Amino acid sequence: MFSTGTVWKNVAAVRQRAPIIHSITNFVVMNTTANALLAAGASPIMAHAPEEMAEMAGIASALVLNIGTLTKPWVESMMLAGMAARERRLPVVLDPVGAGASSLRTTTALEILEKVRPAVVRGNGSEILALAGAAGDTRGVDSARTAHEAVDGARALARRYGAVVVVSGAEDVVTDGDALWLVRGGSPLMPRVTGMGCTATVLVAAHVAVAADVLEGAVTGMAAMSAAGALAARRSQGPGSFQVAFLDVLHSLDLVTVRDEVEVVRA
């Protein structure tokens, strides 16, 4: 069972151990996700040059591959980084942004799944369904499917690739192909701010880097995200002030907030 105590344990561990998260991510969210990692107590590296990927694997605690603004050189860097991480047994978290919206995105995400074998895949309902082989109805990089509509696809994807799959939504779903966990919290403001999904991905990576196992890290990373989002929404007036409030809350997140703002249940 994962409790609020488990969530808090990993929140505190991230602050204490400051895991280095190597993130090859998209132009839209680089600043946002780097600041979120810093606020949570982790240490971001946003390197993407192919020539330094092997060296980055030597110092990182986890790797994030985010396909939001793909180009061929970035695909090369992602594959080099992913293979180096696999060789060193570093956890890799894949964010298949917009999978299903274009063949480049879908084939790249599937190639990473096949060759790198990420520990975690985090996406919205449409992205997960697209990778699972169903019609995901992807609307750009946004989802036309709820997390619950993607449960069967998430389980199938997890079993196929031996990964933990996280489906973000009003209620987040986390599965290793067998167990299914629901994370309840957050705020309707979160989808109104770009980069919140990508932020969830890097927080999951930070938690996986310190957790007892991958499933625990995925659940607690999403729970920390939801708790911070819920409290930040009450302290803000709209999407603009929410972004600032979210970083502040993430930085000062405490056990009381975790206990009061998020619920983690096994389905």
Curated annotation (Swiss-Prot):
Transmembrane segments: none
GO molecular function, one term: magnesium ion binding
Chain sites annotated for binding substrate: M46, G195
Entry EC no(s): 2.7.1.50
Gene Ontology terms: biological process: thiamine biosynthetic process; thiamine diphosphate biosynthetic process
InterPro entries, per database record: Hyethyz_kinase, Ribokinase-like
Keywords for the protein's UniProt record, in alphabetical order: ATP-binding, Kinase, Magnesium, Metal-binding, Nucleotide-binding, Thiamine biosynthesis, Transferase
Annotated metabolic or biological route of this protein: Cofactor biosynthesis; thiamine diphosphate biosynthesis; 4-methyl-5-(2-phosphoethyl)-thiazole from 5-(2-hydroxyethyl)-4-methylthiazole: step 1/1
Functional note: Catalyzes the phosphorylation of the hydroxyl group of 4-methyl-5-beta-hydroxyethylthiazole (THZ).
Family named by the database record: Belongs to the Thz kinase family.
Name of protein: Hydroxyethylthiazole kinase
Source organism phylogeny: Bacteria, Pseudomonadati, Thermodesulfobacteriota, Desulfovibrionia, Desulfovibrionales
Gene name of the record: thiM
